[in-house]
């Protein structure tokens, strides 16, 4: 039921929520009141709220006063319809401050006392409502009329007596001297002209409260105390709300100001906002069922309250004082802190009930230990990480990968024999590390024995969960690595399949139906091999996986790899077409093998026909790839697959059910035109070879005998050319240039590694130059000795010449004979030793009874076995036949080469040149 007359306060800084019934006329609690509090957000206030209740006679303006004080909207009486009962039961409203940092206020408007409608049962309800208001409220407003002061019933004298008696059950002044129930006496229709406010206050305090305090029976401890020890009493005079509305508003502001100054910062009953409804309901039920408040003794409540306050204060002081600790310092620091906290707590709590204080003290120490739970986990975090890294290293060592060779090795064995044990090994390592952690954590159990004795074990499960998470993460990294290797094995199978496909594409009998049927069978066979070979490995790597799952998964992955291979093949399709054309056009079968085509043996017509057929056969591949086939894909539960399976994360986007993307018509035309041009180039090259073979005899047709004759006839020229190249002034520069060329090329090609190859060559060259230099020195020495020998021989010849002047005529005859012989020798270019020449001269001399020129050597030293060139000093290979006929000059007629011999001819013999090898 909502209020019909709402009197808002224009200066109010609060917002009131529409009142809701708490208890109806029959004293039944309304469950909707709890929903009302929840919807209003009251549960979020904690202890930051206050409770205000009001007591007073029926039709005394209680609801109007609450509306004026808190800007509430309780229903008020419509005087135009006569006096009657307006508020029935107990209603509650929630007043929220516009400043969110301020407390909320729960306002209860209760049914008025002295109700004619209640009849004889009015006293029961008055007693119940009074106890309820006193048990819940931070402040109780007593609303009385000025004109009723002095009356027994109208002034609520009996109600006040009930309030005072009930409060004795709730307060123990011995333990909490400052605790007082606040009573606001609001005297309505008061005016200074009627009576001063001080007189009214004295009347309320003395004639009402003190009189009641003296009349009731009190425990012994309250005998010497006044009513002021239990209550904080304030008396306010309120002007008439109708005739003196402005004065009434000012008086209400004074009441509100006093309330704001006296209200506690937190709810005095220490009941949180989310449990307020349950607390209120239990209090109301207790009052109805037992007619008195069945609450624990105030001493225990006070001890519990104060010890809890001390405990809270100490815990709050520890919040910002806890440091980050290392594992080795944790236990020592914690035990020292517990001793310090215990001493600090009992220095204040020892004045209260020992049972309660020890109980709360134990709770305090336990809560201190619980506050250390995050620091405990942080201190042991490094140890947990160490265990995780250790487990990862052990697993990595157990499944070490070696891919350096041609075949993948895991733990120096074939992966298919090792992978099936992966998940089992992971579980064993994880269990081992968890047991190791549990054993280590048992050393951190807290055993405290002092004023309070207790044992405490930290919550180990978060650390175990953290270890399992880290270990699982490390294992997942290794698992993903091995699954990637497994996927590479699967891709390798697919690539091997495509090697066969490419061979099939080079077949001349290729056609569309045959190719796709062949590929379909090959794909199924590859998939079967993959499942047979890799299923146990996959099941071992992925815990809980099944064979059916891998069959479906491998099919999708193979199809993805197939599409990738076909895409790569289409990118290189032009090269493949050229290879097909080259195979069909430039090669032919011979005894089951391909051999190059001999175009010079082919006719022009055969060449044209072969070109046409090869082109058509090569372009058949385009027609094959313009179509494709589909493969039925398996269906999966995406929610299950994505969070559990590794391979599906590698599939970027959806997978098509087609083996490949068919070639478009435009692409086919462009590719055909491009290939046709290159086909034509091959055709023209074949034409050139064919024309060259038919018009001119090939040098390959020259008989081998011709090459043999050519070698014999040109032997002297070949030897002369090689001798020129091997001379020092040509050979040495060539060697130097070759060495530097080799060094430069090696540095360019090999970089830093070039020294490995250049150094041996350099060492070999240096040793060769050293040997060459030694030979050169020896040669110079030999030349010097030959020179001295030559001088002696010349001297002997001159002496012989003087004694043989009569032989000049014989020399002419011998010269003619030798000249004739030399012409014959030169003509046939036959090698001849000088000894043969000398023997020939002796024979001719004997035939003609002439003296031989060798007789000149009879008295001199023996001829040396080797002769030196008289021009350059090198070993002689030639001699002049023209000079050989003159015996005295024969010793000077040796020459090393044709060039030196020509120099001799120009100077000595003129144009008559007769050569012979020595």
UniProtKB/Swiss-Prot annotation:
Provide the residue positions that the database annotates as binding GTP.
Answer: 56-63
Keywords of the record, alphabetical order, are: Coiled coil, Endoplasmic reticulum, GTP-binding, Hydrolase, Membrane, Nucleotide-binding, Transmembrane, Transmembrane helix
Q: Name one GO molecular function term.
A: GTPase activity
| Protein name per UniProt | Protein SEY1 homolog
Give the SUPFAM superfamilies listed for this entry: P-loop containing nucleoside triphosphate hydrolases (SSF52540)
Q: Can the keyword Membrane be found in this entry's annotation?
A: yes
The listed locations are: Endoplasmic reticulum membrane
Pinpoint the GB1/RHD3-type G domain residues.
Answer: 46-280
The UniProt entry, under Pfam families, shows: RHD3_GTPase, Sey1_3HB, zf-HIT
Domain of life, per UniProt, equals Eukaryota
Lumenal compartment residues = 723-725
Please list the residue ranges that the record places on the Cytoplasmic side of the membrane.
Answer: 1-701, 747-918
**Native source species:** Theileria annulata
Instruction: List all membrane-crossing ranges.
Output: 702-722, 726-746
Q: Quote the InterPro entries the UniProt record gives.
A: G_GB1_RHD3_dom (IPR030386), P-loop_NTPase (IPR027417), RHD3/Sey1 (IPR008803), Sey1/RHD3-like_3HB (IPR046758), Znf_HIT (IPR007529)
Instruction: Give the record's family classification.
Output: Belongs to the TRAFAC class dynamin-like GTPase superfamily. GB1/RHD3 GTPase family. RHD3 subfamily.
UniProt GO BP: endoplasmic reticulum membrane fusion
Task: Please tell me where this protein is predominantly located.
Answer: endoplasmic reticulum
Function noted in UniProt? Probable GTP-binding protein that may be involved in cell development.
Query: What's the EC number here?
Result: 3.6.5.-
């Amino acid at each position: 039921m909502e209020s019909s007359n709402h009197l808002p306060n224009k200066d109010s800084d609060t917002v009131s929520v529409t009142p809701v019934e708490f208890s109806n006329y029959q004293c039944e609690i309304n469950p909707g009141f709890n929903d009302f509090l929840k919807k209003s957000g009251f549960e979020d206030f904690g202890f930051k709220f206050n409770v205000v209740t009001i007591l007073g006679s029926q039709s005394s303006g209680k609801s109007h006063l609450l509306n004026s004080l808190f800007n509430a909207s309780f229903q008020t009486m419509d005087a135009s319809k006569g006096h009657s009962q307006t508020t029935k039961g107990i209603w509650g409203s929630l007043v929220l401050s516009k400043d969110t940092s301020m407390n909320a206020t729960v306002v209860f408007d209760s049914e008025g006392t002295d109700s004619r409608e209640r009849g004889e049962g009015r006293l029961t309800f008055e007693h119940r409502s009074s106890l309820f208001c006193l048990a819940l409220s931070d402040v109780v407003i007593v609303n009385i009329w000025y004109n009723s002061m002095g009356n027994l019933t109208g002034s609520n004298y009996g109600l006040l007596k009930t309030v005072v008696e009930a409060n004795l059950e709730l307060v123990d002044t011995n333990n909490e001297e400052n605790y007082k129930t606040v009573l606001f006496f609001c005297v309505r229709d008061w005016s200074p002209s009627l009576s001063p406010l001080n007189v009214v206050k004295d009347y309320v305090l003395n004639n009402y409260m003190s009189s009641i305090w003296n009349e009731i029976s009190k425990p012994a401890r309250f005998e010497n105390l006044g009513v002021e020890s239990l209550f904080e009493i304030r008396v306010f005079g309120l002007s008439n709300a109708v005739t003196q509305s402005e004065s009434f508003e000012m008086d209400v502001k004074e009441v509100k100001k006093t309330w704001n100054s006296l209200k506690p910062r937190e709810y005095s009953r220490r009941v949180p906002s989310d449990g307020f409804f349950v607390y209120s309901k239990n209090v109301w039920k207790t009052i109805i069922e037992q007619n008195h408040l069945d609450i624990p003794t105030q001493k225990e409540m006070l001890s519990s309250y104060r010890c809890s306050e001390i405990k809270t204060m100490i815990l709050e002081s520890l919040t910002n004082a806890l440091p980050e600790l290392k594992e080795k310092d944790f236990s020592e620091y914690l035990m020292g802190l517990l001793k310090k906290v215990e001493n600090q707590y009992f220095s204040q709590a020892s004045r209260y009930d020992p049972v309660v204080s020890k109980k709360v003290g134990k709770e305090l120490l336990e809560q201190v230990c619980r506050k250390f739970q995050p620091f405990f986990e942080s201190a042991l975090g490094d140890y947990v990480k160490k265990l995780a890294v250790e487990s990862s290293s052990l697993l990595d060592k157990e499944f070490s990968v070696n891919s350096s060779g041609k075949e993948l090795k895991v733990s120096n064995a074939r992966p298919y024999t090792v992978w099936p044990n992966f998940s089992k090994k992971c579980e064993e390592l994880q269990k081992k590390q968890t047991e190791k952690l549990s054993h280590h954590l048992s050393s951190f159990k807290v055993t405290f024995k002092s004023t309070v004795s207790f044992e405490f074990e930290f919550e180990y499960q978060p650390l175990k969960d953290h270890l399992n998470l880290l270990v699982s993460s490390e294992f997942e990294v290794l698992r993903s690595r091995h699954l990637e290797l497994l996927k590479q094995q699967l891709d390798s199978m697919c690539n091997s399949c495509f090697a066969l496909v490419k061979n099939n594409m080079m077949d001349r009998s290729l056609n569309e139906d045959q190719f796709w049927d062949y590929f379909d069978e090959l794909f199924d066979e590859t998939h079967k091999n993959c499942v047979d070979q890799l299923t146990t490995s996959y099941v071992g790597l992925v815990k809980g996986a099944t064979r059916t799952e891998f069959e479906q998964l491998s099919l999708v992955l193979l199809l993805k790899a197939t599409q990738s291979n076909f895409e790569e093949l289409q990118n290189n399709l032009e090269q493949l077409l050229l290879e097909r054309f080259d195979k069909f056009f430039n090669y032919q079968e011979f005894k089951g093998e391909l051999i190059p085509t001999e175009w010079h043996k082919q006719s022009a017509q055969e060449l044209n026909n072969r070109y046409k057929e090869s082109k058509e056969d090569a372009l058949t591949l385009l027609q094959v790839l313009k179509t494709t086939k589909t493969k039925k894909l398996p269906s999966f539960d995406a929610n299950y697959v994505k969070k559990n399976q590794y391979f599906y994360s590698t599939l970027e986007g959806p997978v098509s059910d087609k083996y490949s993307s068919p070639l478009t018509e435009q692409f086919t035309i462009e590719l055909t035109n491009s290939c046709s041009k290159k086909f034509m180039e091959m055709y023209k090259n074949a034409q050139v070879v064919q024309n060259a073979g038919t018009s001119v005899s090939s040098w390959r047709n020259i008989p081998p005998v011709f090459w043999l004759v050519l070698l014999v006839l040109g032997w002297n020229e070949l030897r002369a050319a090689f001798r020129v190249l091997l001379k020092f002034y040509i050979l040495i520069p060539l060697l130097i240039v070759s060495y530097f060329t080799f060094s430069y090329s090696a540095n360019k090609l090999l970089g830093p590694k070039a020294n490995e190859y250049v150094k041996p060559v350099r060492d070999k060259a240096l040793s060769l130059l050293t040997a060459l230099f030694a030979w050169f020195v020896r040669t110079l020495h030999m030349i010097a000795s030959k020179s001295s020998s030559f001088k002696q021989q010349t001297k002997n010849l001159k002496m012989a010449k003087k004694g043989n002047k009569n032989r000049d005529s014989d020399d002419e005859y011998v010269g003619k004979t030798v000249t004739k012989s030399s012409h014959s020798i030169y003509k046939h270019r036959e090698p001849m030793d000088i000894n043969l020449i000398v023997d020939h001269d002796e024979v001719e001399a004997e035939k003609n009874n002439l003296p031989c020129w060798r007789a000149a050597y009879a008295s001199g030293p023996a001829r040396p076995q080797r002769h030196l060139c008289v021009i350059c000093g090198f070993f002689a290979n030639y001699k002049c036949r023209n000079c050989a006929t003159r015996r005295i000059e024969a010793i000077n007629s040796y020459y090393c080469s044709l060039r030196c011999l020509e120099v001799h001819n120009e100077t000595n013999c003129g144009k008559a040149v007769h050569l012979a090898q020595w």
